[in-house]
């Protein structure tokens, strides 16, 4: 589990797996790698 802090993908406090940002189990947008 890695917390991603990105403003480009609106990913704040989300769970990131393999560089992919997930929101409540759903695929949001690619954030940090």
UniProtKB/Swiss-Prot annotation:
SUPFAM superfamilies: Defensin-like (SSF57392)
Signal peptide (from-to): none
GO terms, biological process: defense response to bacterium; defense response to fungus; killing of cells of another organism
Disulfide links within the chain: 4-32, 6-21, 11-31
Subcellular location: Secreted
Swiss-Prot/TrEMBL keywords: Antibiotic, Antimicrobial, Defensin, Disulfide bond, Fungicide, Secreted
Domain of life: Eukaryota
Purpose of the protein: Has antibacterial activity against the Gram-negative bacterium E.coli and the Gram-positive bacteria L.monocytogenes and S.aureus. Has antifungal activity against C.albicans.
UniProt similarity note: Belongs to the alpha-defensin family.
Name of this protein: Defensin-1
Species annotation: Papio hamadryas (Hamadryas baboon)
